[in-house]
Amino acid sequence: MSFGLPTTGMTALKGLREEYAKRTVEGDIGMRYSIHGIVDATDIAHVSELSGLSEQRCKELIDYLSVHTDVVPKDDDDELEALDYALASLAIEVAVTRHAGHLEQYYSPMGISYMQIGKDLTAVKTVIVTGGALIHTKRTAQIASHALFNPLDAFSLKPKEAQVLVDRKYILAAMGILSTEYPQTALRIMKKELVKDGNH
């Protein structure tokens, strides 16, 4: 959580300041029921590049998984594991890009200036991830790294350096409820249960 106000000179905030705690839900991107949403939000070429599979094979597997939503990678299913890695990475990238703010460049009498739309999350120090595709893989840290700033998207205000914690037991929702009455207890449980899975 962060107020996300501009942190650099010559940057103005566009619109109203957002709340300290902000929640977004990306219902159009998911690993099975909304699997086509990931492709729509990025493109099949990105899925192919990250998975190492051909675009045609990615399309075939994605169509199959959209119907057979209970299928998960088995130990010997390298194709499906590679596809899930790509889909989870892109889902996180899209979700955090939408959640974070971004800069727009414009010219003023003072020279190049910037307009900030949304929250500046570049200084956020911790990212917590959860979900089956992140819990049941050995590549959690690699997938979670897609939540962080990418120099190729220079105007994004995603976190630049953040410790990645994994909620492997799906406790976050319960801790949110618990924290309304017992905040210290909820914090203590989260500190114990959230697992460090890479420092980027």
Predicted regions and their residues:
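Helical "lid/coupling" subdomains associated with nucleotide-phosphate turnover
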Residues: 1-200
